[in-house]
């Protein structure tokens, strides 16, 4: 059975880009007779906004979204992540890293998603002394191409060794890294389809590699076009994207429907009616492949 999900981070309030992702993932799930889960990705407390998680859920309800089951909170799922890391440790796929960021980024080259880790701590003889600090844990990546067929973008591939390097699963400050948590959650929740923004396209080969290491299914992926401002920057909390105005719910839903190349939506009394209409008219093949500049 199709199981999709929407996984916001409570580092701020929902904005127009969030609404596009929620609407597209919801329409794809419901049009396929599937479930739509909501998962709160609250892995990084220092960056989170007090009250944002509750505000996000209230906003989704106000826009007519209905999710299946209880909301999952990553902050309550640490035991799952510990079990997942233990499996990788037992398999000899991960190692402790005592490098500071300055240690390994000095002289490092840029790859697909920041600097490529130089592998200094792969060899136990070359690891810096712990100096009483907890290590990060990294996973060894293969020198081979990992690719997949995306439902919107088409073919996408990376050589993890050359483009990314061994990446962190547990940070030295004790917080779980996104890549491990999202793979563990998707597997445990039975997620079969992931519809999300193209900013996460670069993360997908890492997640597929983790899925292979853990022998769990790889979902089908579809990465949505990003909404950008006049300067070409992705609308986000960092670029001061305004929070969704609950007094303009129908107007904002019609706006994201246009971005997704849906037909012109009819008048409706409630946002839920507009979402039902979007489900009935959903066509992934018509979703644009490239970024969309918005006012």
UniProtKB/Swiss-Prot annotation:
Pfam families per record: tRNA-synt_1c
Top-level EC class: ligase
Motif stretch ('HIGH' region): 8-18
Positions of Zn(2+) binding: 97, 99, 117, 121
Cofactor note: Binds 1 zinc ion per subunit.
Binding-site list for L-glutamate: 5-9, 41, 178, 196
UniProtKB keywords: Aminoacyl-tRNA synthetase, ATP-binding, Ligase, Metal-binding, Nucleotide-binding, Zinc
One of the GO BP terms on file: tRNA modification
Cofactor(s) demanded: Zn(2+)
Catalytic activity, EC: 6.1.1.-
GO terms under cellular component: cytosol
Sequence motif 'KMSKS' region, residues: 234-238
Any one GO MF annotation of this record: zinc ion binding
Binding site for ATP: 237
Entry function: Catalyzes the tRNA-independent activation of glutamate in presence of ATP and the subsequent transfer of glutamate onto a tRNA(Asp). Glutamate is transferred on the 2-amino-5-(4,5-dihydroxy-2-cyclopenten-1-yl) moiety of the queuosine in the wobble position of the QUC anticodon.
PANTHER family given in the database record: GLUTAMATE--TRNA LIGASE, GLUTAMYL-Q TRNA(ASP) SYNTHETASE
Family to which this protein belongs: Belongs to the class-I aminoacyl-tRNA synthetase family. GluQ subfamily.
HAMAP family with a match to the protein in the record: Glu_Q_tRNA_synth (MF_01428)
Protein name: Glutamyl-Q tRNA(Asp) synthetase
Organism of this sequence: Neisseria meningitidis serogroup A / serotype 4A (strain DSM 15465 / Z2491)
Gene: gluQ
């Amino acid at each position: 059975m199709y199981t999709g999900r929407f996984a916001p981070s409570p580092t701020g309030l929902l904005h127009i880009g969030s609404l596009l992702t929620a609407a597209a993932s919801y329409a794809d799930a419901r049009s396929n007779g599937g479930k739509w889960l909501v998962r709160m990705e609250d892995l990084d407390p220092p960056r989170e906004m007090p009250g944002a998680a509750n505000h996000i859920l209230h906003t989704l309800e106000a826009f007519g979204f209905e999710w299946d089951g209880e909301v999952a909170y990553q902050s309550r799922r640490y035991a799952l992540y510990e079990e997942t890391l233990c499996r990788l440790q037992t398999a000899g796929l991960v190692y402790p890293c005592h490098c500071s960021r300055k240690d390994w980024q000095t002289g490092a080259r840029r790859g697909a998603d920041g600097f490529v880790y130089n592998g200094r701590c792969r060899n136990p003889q070359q690891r810096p002394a712990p100096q009483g600090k907890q290590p990060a844990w990294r996973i060894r990546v293969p020198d081979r191409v990992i690719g997949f067929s995306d439902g919107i973008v088409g073919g996408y591939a990376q050589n993890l060794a050359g483009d990314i390097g061994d990446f962190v699963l547990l940070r030295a400050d004790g917080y779980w890294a996104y890549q491990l948590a999202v793979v563990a959650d998707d597997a445990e929740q039975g997620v079969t389809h992931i519809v999300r923004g193209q900013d996460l396209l670069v993360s997908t080969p890492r997640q597929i590699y983790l899925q292979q290491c853990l022998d769990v299914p790889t979902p089908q992926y579809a990465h949505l076009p990003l909404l950008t401002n006049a300067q070409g920057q992705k609308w986000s909390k960092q670029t001061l994207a305004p929070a969704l105005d609950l007094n303009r719910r129908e107007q904002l839903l019609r706006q994201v429907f246009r971005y997704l190349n849906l037909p012109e939506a009819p008048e409706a009394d409630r946002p839920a009616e507009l979402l039902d209409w979007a489900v009935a008219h959903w066509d992934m093949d018509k979703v644009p492949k490239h970024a969309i500049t918005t006012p």
